[in-house]
Design a protein with these regions (language model features):
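Non-transmembrane functional regions of envelope-associated proteins
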Residues: 1-188
């Protein structure tokens, strides 16, 4: 059988019918990462953003379900968050997380994302790049675990047609790689 160098795992209607509505618990996403890695994936990328903590983490259940006894609450609080479980899976694989440029600056909690390793030689390229004043990124526990981060923002021309997908863009005055460009960096 011929090898397939690229496989796209699509969260489609059939997946949603079988596994439930999106967003899935981060533990399920962690299982996907682990399974893909076990199957030989050399790089895994997400073109979705995990911008908020998982609403299904055990510690949140301990607070939300009022009828739980204190012993059960304490057991739930002692479990790792679903985000930590996913971060652990990310660390065991080569995962590139997606980010998206925004037309406005949106305040986000947490530390700044890890530095991007892009150097520019010669004149300043910033005036020639697609530019986004804002950036929507993943929560820090996931960001810090990832092998890379890349933008999956695209812009159409005035007629609504997308003719170019740049390899680098500008977001919050920082040169950032596209998702696919960052995947190439991480895999090599």
């Amino acid at each position: 059988a011929p090898q397939r160098p690229v496989v796209i795992l699509d969260i489609d209607e059939q997946s949603l019918r079988k596994l439930g509505q999106w967003p899935w618990p981060r533990t399920r996403v962690a299982d996907l990462i682990t399974r893909l890695t076990d199957l030989g994936a050399v790089v895994i990328a997400f073109d979705v953003i995990f911008a908020e903590p998982d609403r299904l983490s055990p510690v949140l259940a301990a607070e939300v379900f009022r009828d739980l006894d204190e012993e059960t609450r304490n057991k739930l609080r002692a479990l790792p968050s679903n985000d930590q479980v996913m971060a652990d899976a990310i660390r065991q694989s080569k995962v590139v997380l997606g980010e998206t440029g925004l037309p406005i600056v949106v305040p986000q909690s947490g530390a700044q994302p890890p530095a991007v390793g892009i150097a520019a030689l010669g004149s300043d390229p910033k005036p020639f790049l697609f530019s986004f004043p804002g950036l929507l990124r993943n929560i820090p526990v996931l960001d810090n675990a990832a092998a890379g981060r890349g933008l999956f923002s695209i812009r159409s021309e005035r007629d609504g047609i997308i003719r170019r997908v740049p390899t680098v863009m500008l977001a919050q005055d920082t040169i950032k790689p596209s998702l696919t460009f960052e995947m190439l960096r991480v895999v090599t």
